Amino acid sequence: MVELTNEIIDYQTLTEQIRSDQAGAVVLFLGTVREMTKGRQTLALDYDAFPEMAVAKMEELEAEVRDRWPITNVGIVHRLGHLELGEISVAVAVSSPHRELAFEAGKYLIDTLKMTVPVWKKE
């Protein structure tokens, strides 16, 4: 499940969507707007994307993770628009039978998403 949204990310709903009776672990990563970036104070961030391209890349990433790890479910949600300090910009959730797999897949997801999905932020 992948989504780009201009709305506040509901990470509780995301977590419920990926939970499964076959999964003994659910890992959730939330990226938030932090106050300091490279020694400079951040007041807010604006996120923009080419939606079709970003969703396509997110779907490719979801498929890749499903191929590499025996996970149960995956959820990726990225927010667009103007975000204030503390607001959630991205949520990645993974469920799997065991926690080690969920952590590995979740870390790979967020690291690869940051490098490959065409979403830009402006301070």
Question: Language-model features: where?
Answer:
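N-terminal, polar/charged subdomain of small-to-medium soluble alpha/beta proteins
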Residues: 1-90, 95-123
